Amino acid sequence: MSKIKPLSKSSQDLSLLTSDIASFASSIGLASALPSSGFNDTDFRKPAKSKTQKRKKPKKDQQHKDEDEEGEPKSNIGNEKGKDFGARKQNKDAPVKQTLQPKPKPGFLSIDDESTGYKKKRFDEFKSLPKLPLVKASLLSSEWYNDAAEFEEKVFGGRKVAVANKEDFKGVVEKKRELGERLMWQYAEDFATSKGKGGDMKMVISAQKSGTVADKITAFEIMVGENPIANMRSLDALLGMVTSKVGKRFAFKGLKALSEILIRLLPDRKLKSLLQRPLNIIPENKDGYSLLLFWYWEDCLKQRYERFVTALDESSKDMLPELKDKALKTIYFMLTSKSEQERKLLVSLVNKLGDPQNKSASNADYHLTNLLADHPNMKAVVIDEVDSFLFRPHLGLRAKYHAVNFLSQIRLSHKGEDPKVAKRLIDVYFALFKVLTTEANRKQGADDKGAADKKKSNPKDTKQEVSTDSPIELDSRILSALLTGVNRAFPYVSTDEADDIIESQTPVLFKLVHSANFNVGVQSLMLLDKISSKNKIVSDRFYRALYSKLLLPSAMNSSKAEMFIGLLLRAMKNDINIKRVAAFSKRVLQVALQQPPQYACGCLFLLSEVLKSRPPLWKMVVQRESVEEEEDIEHFEDVIEGDDVDPNKKAENDENVVEVDHDGVEKSSRDGDSSSDDEEALAIRLSDEEDDNASDDSEELIRNETPQLEEVMEVSNDMEKRSQPPMRPSSLPGGYDPRHREPSYCNADRASWWELGVLSKHAHPSVATMAGTLLSGTNIVYNGNPLNDLSLTAFLDKFMEKKPKQNTWHGGSQIEPSKKLDMSNRVIGAEILSLAEGDVAPEDLVFHKFYVNKMTSTKQSKKKKKKKLPEEEAAEELYDVNDGDGGENYDSDVEFEAGDESDNEEIENMLDDVDDNAVEEEGGEYDYDDLDGVAGEDDEELVADVSDAEMDTDMDMDLIDDEDDNNVDDDGTGDGGDDDSDGDDGRSKKKKKEKRKRKSPFASLEEYKHLIDQDEKEDSKTKRKATSEPTKKKKKKKSKASE
Amino acid sequence: MGKLGKKARKFAKKNLQSVEKRSRKLKPFIKKKFAKRNERHQAGDKQEKKVEQQPKKRCQEEEFQDIAIDAVFGKDDDEVLRDGDSDSDGYLDELVNETDSDIMKCKVLSRSFLATCCDMVDKEQYVPALVRLLNWYRAACQYGHEPSGIARPNIYYDIEDSETFAKVIIFVLQKADHTFRSILGLSDSSTKEKILKLKNNPKWDSLKPLVKSFFRSTLHLVKQAGDLEIISFTLTQLRVSIVFLAAFPDLLKKLIKISVHLWVTGEETISQQAFLILKDISMVFNSECFDSCLINMYKAFLHDCDIPKANSEQRPFLRDSLVELCSQDVQKSYTKASVSITQLAKLLKMALATKNKEAVEKIHSGEYINCVDLWVNFISANVQDCDLQPLLYTIVQVINGVAQLIIGPRYLLLRVKCIHWLNHLSRTSGIFIPIASLVLDMLEYKTTNDGEKQEQKLEAVSTVKLPKNWLKSQNFQEQCIFSVIELLAVHFAQWSFHISFPDLATIPVMRLKKFHERSTMEGLKRVVKRFIEQVESNIEFVQRKRDDVTFSPNDQQSADTFMQLEKQNANAPYTQYYQSIIDKALGTNKKKKK
């Protein structure tokens, strides 16, 4: 097989080639003919025995030769120079430009025929020249670069050859380039004569010349696949298709073909141009020429690839969205698979984030995320690129939003470079934030009243006069994305750097806290909490802000409710000031009284968790309102003496005193009604005072934003101590003041949790049960997310006995792969009967009863039909009588239902009629997939409300997850990898402890094993694991529990 | 199907069941048309037979106003009457073709004769006289509706003058029941069982046709009479003899249908009378009757809701009477209610899921709202005595869903209604239903004050959705605030003596204060201010009392007895205040109705 006809044609020039080299060359030929790659040990392992024996000798030879060559590079150079000059003389008349532009004529969809133009002349020239010794075209392996590497190895023997960096080197390069061209021509000729004679090839060639576009493309593909070096013209033709400005349909087809070809052609390293090669030391023998050929080819390929990338970039900016998408995909594809031109590719990919079309922009986002998943090392580079993209002038908000969104989705870890990356990210975020705010400033300066639609929410601006104006949608979204990003990245910043960030950024965050948008506020509070928990400095200001946030009606309506509750829990648990915790608890209870059941449950559960870590709070439940003074209470209320209105309680004394005091307050505030100016002044003065205390510069804002002006007034009056005769006893007797702005001064620790009394009468059974549980002095045990489980939709789903369709979670971030799995865990319909009544969750009890009735009634009716003996009837009657008085007895229903089966049907039928069959249609109407599709589209729409919510929730979930991680870390576990298992252990222990445990209606762990396994895999990759839903759901609870 | 070939027809019969069914349905109509026309043109037994046959088919889908239904019973009538005819005197021979009522050429029934008949029946329970009387009664009932004299050429009953006419009817209606009973030897209070036992009584066999005839004629009268007083009187008298209907299930069904129809469509008194009948029926007879009453009424009620009517004040009566009926057998109604509420929930779910216009419209339809209204009232009427917890829970959830389905000032009325319901449920059941946030959200409606004062009252709108231009009116804003105050007042009034009232009211008061600051309308500000003051004084009061207590929150019993004494006397200023607001709201509602 290795019958290389070595020296027949190159006899004159290479007389120095000896027979041993010929044999060596043949052995190399053998190696190169092997399909396997590279000049590595596989070559030694793989071939059959005979070959290895054969090889051993050449190996030695090679070593010899290497030694030889080592000795004589200089002389070689000298020789070469001479040769080069000779060669140059030979090609003297060929213009240099020609070589620089290997493709002068962009022949569209045709190989440039050798019969045209000066190229032909050149080739004619080449024809006239003697043939140089060269590797045979037919011997090319499937990966040319392996062959090239082999030749390199052969020529230089694996030494590193420094590239000469002289000026005159260029000249050498030019010469060699010409030589390379000649060699390539010769090579192509060789290919044409050897292989091109085959029938297949002929057909292919004819297809190239006269075929449909598809044919031509395929033909080109085949040619290039056959031997890329010899068929560079085919490659050029394909490139021409793509770069051509004329036909986009060619571009469509060409892009795919070309990208496939190029993926095959490109090595895993970067391509080198001729300039980077040690051309001056290349020997002028067959190997040398062959190597030169390969180098030249590589150079050509590099140029072509560059053109291809340029073309890609261009078509990614095309008008046609399809072409754009295709180009984008190809860019991503090329970028992930090959490193050549990665910079350019990356730039154009990042650039697509600014695409005016949301779809393309989010595609770019998606591709970038995937890219980082494939090549985590590229994070820094990509972030830099996005950074420079972000701060381009005149960049639209939308583009910024997409960019920030992408950045915030980057996965981070504590290992390696990631802390630095995180730091970098945070810098970017804050820099962007600054830009946004200054822009807003400028805009506001430009036109005072207008710019409402584009206004960035800048608390500084909105503070005074426009504080009621809600920041515009887009704006809050980008802010929210920014904050999400910061929240995510912050935990990964190394500690010392974190301090700097805190130092510089806290004021900004506090401004954000008071943004009119609740979500923004919560997220910044979240971040503040994170910061402060890291530093162990929990500022009063933070708590005050949080406390006031509780009052906002949107607190529970927003998509961030879950996050907010999580934040509250953490804040309350970490708080050392028990009075403040008490104040928070009271207010949480009051909020629970106002909100829909699921939030009430959330609040109660939150309190239960707080109670676990703050057992002293129990006394607010189980003890009467504390009247005895505690030593750490401020003593201002002890000062004044008062007449005993209620003399029966001895400890009441000082409270009564305060009552007197408060009478004055009441009175004065009543007076204040008439003279509101006066009050206003007082209020402002007071707020000033308070500002002094708390050094809070945004105090005024709080005052405006939260309905606490009244309270301020009262306090101010209090301070005035305008004592007046007690008209009537006032509330707030020395103790709890629900309206105080500063939670630690509310004296909430003296108030009992009377709210539980009302809550235990709540219409929703779960709320009632939870409140009852707390009242009985035990902790609530609940494995679920009340916000989801008890929501109205969940209720309706259960009511309809409908297992919600399992919707596939598409898109989404990698951090949060899925969150909708939990629906499948529900016990639906008659399945609920498998549980004992005691195990059924309170909110499901209704259904349980319902099905119990249903089951027994059907049984009974059957029985009845079967045999209707008089005794039985009598017994039934008796039964009936018994039921008459016992309302609790559900068998009575059964009895009735037994007779009513048909009636039920009738009613149902009738109702159906009445409803115009609306109900019947429901099967068709609940296409969740469709809905999802819509939602997905919305997701990409920056303006859409819905997507906002969706996106936000994703992030929430994730954030909570994150927190969990962080907390475990903070607790000193340190090792993130163990988080999961730790959590699980804790959970199982907790489970055992459960008193009122409900038998889990959820599927067993085994069913989710595959998911968990998946997680583990992911864990190994990154520290931050994306927990699958079932664990996650519990985990969320857990996060509340454990924090 | 007429044009199809034989094979095609065969195929259709085999495979297109629905077509077959429809054609079956259509046929009687067509035939009936012919029949009626024929009836007019050619009298005769032949024709009669034909008429008799069709009704059997028609029985499947009998309708109220369908004359063909009469024919069904007409056939039986003939039998009965023929029996009686044999006893009648020679008046039968007289045939008069002219039916002009004023001329009355054939004086078949004279005043004097009637008097004697009545006398005989009244005093001696003389059966032949009764038979004759019933024949006349029948004729009177059918008067003007039956082509008299033609259908039965050999017998013809006519009535002398309007006085006689009235007397026949009145006498029969008044005395029939008593007469039947005395003939059968029953007391006035005999039960259904006794009636059923009559089967073995030989007297019954002879009397049965008479009773049947009486009912049939009466039903006809009720259905056809134009005069409200007659109907009303008839219904009243009919009530007494309802027990006899146990023997005639068909007639019973018919009566139910008629009564339901009257109940829904009739005037106030008739409606009431009809309801009383229905109630009696459901009380006297077995559960099946109760069900059919309930279902029919329910259906009719909901159907009625769709029809925009001028007198919408009757709807509460309908609802209340239906509730009353349901309350008779709570357990049975319970299952009906749960089925119905499931339907409501289904619709709600659909609306929530799709948010498309039709689904939402469905929620806002009068039908849906009235259905909710019905069950809310049912539950609140019975929740004290029975365990309706599941129903309560589900309906509260549904109402909450409806209230939050579409948020916006345009749906203010619906929301107010929802909160009313919740308040109602909460008050009657004693459970806590959080409404404050729902109410207070109404304060946030962004309305402008620049709109000129609108003349119309909001309540004039029958639709749930308000027209857009109203939203800007000052009137609307006032209405918003007044509703808020009213709803909150109801809510607070319920809990005003509860130990956790101070905490309950804290946040609403805060939000109201905020609104008070923000608002620019002086009139509204004053109202709000006053409300805040009252609530605060209430808070203080409870707080003061609470400070004295010695028990802890987990002592539920003590907490429940807390301030029970104070609750009894409604002299507390804020209680009076709440009451005044509620009364005022009621007053304005009433005023608006008028």
From Swiss-Prot, chain A:
Residue span of motif Nuclear localization signal 2 = 441-448
**Tissue localization of expression:** Mainly expressed in actively dividing tissues (e.g. root tips, lateral root primordia, shoot apices, young leaves, inflorescences and pollen grains) through the plant, including roots, stems, leaves, inflorescences, siliques and seedlings, and in gametophytes.
The Gene Ontology biological process terms listed for this entry are: embryo sac development; polar nucleus fusion; pollen development; regulation of cell division
Keyword line = Nucleus
Q: Which InterPro entries match?
A: ARM-type_fold (IPR016024), CCAAT-binding_factor (IPR005612), CEBPZ/Mak21-like (IPR040155)
Among its keywords, does the record have Nucleus?
yes
Result of knocking out the encoding gene: Female gametophyte mutant with impaired progression of the mitotic cycles and lost synchrony of female gametophyte development leading to an arrest of female gametophytes at the two-, four-, or eight-nucleate stage and characterized by unfused polar nuclei. Defective pollen development.
Database matches in Pfam families: CBF
* Compositional bias ranges of the Basic and acidic residues kind: 80-95, 444-466, 646-673, 1006-1031
User: Where would you find this protein in the cell?
Assistant: Nucleus; Nucleus, Nucleolus
Report the residue ranges where the short sequence motif Nuclear localization signal 1 is annotated in this entry: 44-51
GO CC annotations, alphabetized: nucleolus
For region Disordered, the annotated ranges are 32-113, 444-469, 632-737, 861-1043
Query: Where along the sequence does the record place the motif called Nuclear localization signal 3?
Result: 1022-1029
Biased region (Basic residues) positions are 47-59, 988-1000, 1032-1043
- Bias (Acidic residues) ranges: 632-645, 688-699, 872-983
- Record function comment: Together with NOC2, probably involved in pre-ribosome export from the nucleus to the cytoplasm. Required for coordinated cell cycle progression during female gametophyte and pollen development.
Its quaternary organisation is:
Interacts with RBL in both the nucleolus and nucleoplasm. Binds to NOC2.
Q: Which family does it belong to?
A: Belongs to the CBF/MAK21 family.
Name-wise, this protein is Protein SLOW WALKER 2
Q: Which organism is it from?
A: Arabidopsis thaliana
Swiss-Prot record, chain B:
A single GO BP term for this record reads: floral meristem determinacy
Q: Where is this motif: Nuclear localization signal 2?
A: 35-42
Residue ranges of the motif Nuclear localization signal 1: 8-15
Q: Does the keyword Coiled coil apply?
A: no
The protein's superkingdom reads Eukaryota
Task: For this UniProt record, give its keywords in alphabetical order, as a comma-separated list.
Answer: Nucleus
| GO terms under cellular component | nucleolus; nucleoplasm; nucleus
Q: Where is the composition biased (Basic residues)?
A: 1-13
Query: Where do the record's region annotations for Disordered lie?
Result: 1-21, 35-58
Give the motif span (Nuclear localization signal 3): 512-519
The free-text tissue note of the record is: Expressed at low levels in roots, shoots, leaves, stems, inflorescences, flowers and siliques, with highest levels dividing tissues.
Q: Could you tell me where the Basic and acidic residues compositional bias lies?
A: 36-58
Give the knockout phenotype. Answer: Plants lacking both CRC and RBL exhibit strong floral meristem (FM) indeterminacy with reiterations of extra floral whorls in the center of the flower associated with reduced AGAMOUS and SUPERMAN levels.
Localization = Nucleus; Nucleus, Nucleolus; Nucleus, Nucleoplasm
Which InterPro entries does the record associate with it? Noc2 (IPR005343)
Keyword Cell inner membrane belongs to the record: no
Q: What else is known?
A: 'Rebelote' means once again in French.
Q: Which family does it belong to?
A: Belongs to the NOC2 family.
In UniProt terms, what function does this protein have?
A: Collaboratively with CYP40/SQN and ULT1, influences floral meristem (FM) determinacy in an AGAMOUS and SUPERMAN-dependent manner, thus contributing to the floral developmental homeostasis.
> Quaternary structure per UniProt?
Interacts with SWA2, NOC2 and NOC3 in both the nucleolus and nucleoplasm. Binds to ENAP1 and OBE1.
Q: Which PANTHER family does the UniProt entry name for this protein?
A: NUCLEOLAR COMPLEX 2 AND RAD4-RELATED, PROTEIN REBELOTE
Name of the protein in question = Protein REBELOTE
Its gene is RBL
